[in-house]
Design a protein with these regions (language model features):
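Positively charged
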Residues: 1-178
């Protein structure tokens, strides 16, 4: 199931391990541009390739923009969390693939991520206790077949899935969190 070009849960593509990108081709560059546009058009701060049906390790993130003139998302190819704190803190997160709800989950409050950019440069991203920190982890989870539901405790998950089903029945679209 899709809305606005975004794959919606429980589509099985969101549960797949994504392939490593071996070469940065013009097709990968074009896909990254498409993802940036889709992320912006749907009001997201992050988008992973499986969320548009592409099962490869490609992510776009921009937690800082205020309008399209300031819009310059990061493109992360084959991102890997190389360090993370043991200290977990609660974060409220939403997902373009799970519209209409937000969930409070616990995540490490500090991560270091390594990924390649579109010029094949290895870039190191470090984030602590902010939206960027959550977004990095959330989008990397997508590349390994996990959604925000997997971060929830069992009873929280049951409640969140019910809220999501109700939101879909009301016609929730990507970018809506309540």
């Amino acid at each position: 199931m899709e809305a606005n070009g975004i794959v919606l849960s429980p589509d099985p593509r969101l549960r797949q391990e994504c392939a490593v990108i071996e070469e940065i081709t013009p097709a990968i560059e074009a896909l990254a541009e498409k993802m940036k546009k889709m992320m912006f058009d749907n009001g997201g701060c992050g988008l992973a390739a499986p969320q548009i049906g592409e099962l490869i390790q490609l992510v776009t993130i921009d937690c800082d923009y205020t309008d399209k003139n300031d819009y310059d998302p990061y493109v992360l190819i084959n991102p890997v969390i190389v360090e993370q704190s043991d200290h977990l803190v609660p974060f409220s997160e939403g997902c373009l693939s799970i519209p209409g709800i937000s969930c409070e989950s616990e995540r490490p409050d500090h991560v270091v991520v390594e990924a390649y950019d579109l010029d094949a440069n290895l870039i190191r991203y470090e984030a602590s206790g902010d939206l960027f920190c959550v977004c990095l982890q959330h989008e990397i989870d997508h590349l390994h077949g996990n959604t925000m539901f997997e971060r929830l405790k069992p009873m929280q998950r049951i409640k969140a899935v019910k809220e999501y089903q109700d939101a879909l029945a009301r016609g929730a679209r990507p970018g809506e969190t309540e």
